Amino acid sequence: MLGLHVGTLISLSLCILLEPVEGSLMQPCQPINQTVSLEKEGCPTCLVIQTPICSGHCITKEPVFRSPFSTVYQHVCTYRDVRYEMIRLPDCPPWVDPHVTYPVALSCDCSLCNMDTSDCTIESLQPDFCITQRVLTDGDMW
């Protein structure tokens, strides 16, 4: 009985000691300001802006035993509440609609990745990647 009690105290103490370390290393799932690029086929430049996106750590569990009959679902930091804003890209030809809509994160949540609204890949391009010439929102070129 004493061994069980001592083992429990050691486990509890270890959890209490490790909790602040883990909390300080991983940011929670929340909106953060991020530089992103907006571009559209037919327009010669991409616009670089700052907007809130969802980013941070979500607790996930990896099963010890993997069954071929079950699926493992991992939670990711994704949009809970989102607003869409529209911006006009500069220098688009007259036959191309210069307006681009982009999401603005109002709140975030750890949930399954929705491929309709999020980039669910393991490795993707950075959010500020541009194929065309970059223009800052103040008009300067990169």
Swiss-Prot record:
Stretch forming the signal peptide: 1-23
Gene3D superfamilies for the chain: Cystine-knot cytokines
Disulfide pairings: C29-C77, C43-C92, C46-C130, C54-C108, C58-C110, C113-C120
Subcellular location(s) per record: Secreted
Keywords: Disulfide bond, Glycoprotein, Hormone, Secreted, Signal
GO CC terms, sorted: cytoplasm; extracellular space
Database matches in InterPro entries: Cystine-knot_cytokine, Glyco_hormone_CN, Gonadotropin_bsu, Gonadotropin_bsu_CS
Main location: secreted
Gene Ontology molecular function terms on file: hormone activity
UniProt xrefs under PANTHER family: GLYCOPROTEIN HORMONE BETA CHAIN, LUTROPIN SUBUNIT BETA
Family designation: Belongs to the glycoprotein hormones subunit beta family.
Oligomer status and interactors: Heterodimer of an alpha and a beta chain.
Protein name: Gonadotropin subunit beta-2
Native species: Oncorhynchus masou (Cherry salmon)
